[in-house]
Amino acid sequence: VNRVLSEPIADETISLAPKTRGRMPAIGLSTDAAGTVLMPEADEDGWCLGRESVEAALDAMRRGEPVVVTDDADRENEGDLIFAAETATAETLAFTVRHTSGVICVAMPGERLDELRLGPMVARNEDPKGTAFAVSVDLLGGDMTTGISASDRARTLRALADPEATADKFCRPGHLFPLRARP
């Protein structure tokens, strides 16, 4: 699952889970001359700690670059490719779909989901992790086609991040999956 932040990126404390040491092949992210993404160096226990790595990730996201964030082994034990919705481009979405599961989720505050009338996807959530999926969505109008293309999904993400966008600008169901953010 790939998560996209719909709120502007602020400086805040973030807890990072253990990371894999070394390099990860990727295209389109900040890379070295060989096209390899350099991951932060982990300590002997596999943790990347410290404000410096968090600040570097936030700076990258402000520039519109995706960042890999891993969760705890007792959660999903996976990495998520995250980026700011306000900076979404067709290229970022194409890369994300090509190099991940292709499921694009967008983390949003509950208040904003309520404003956009994006309620829970199901009445009874049976997800073992309790992931709070909202009704999937696409942007309406403009140059939108079916909603599935990288450019359509980028437009939808930017619209979800736009505080001026209203509920009538979206159709349900769609190809992006909002998640109700929890503290």
Model-derived features: positions:
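Catalytic domains of riboflavin
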Residues: 2-183
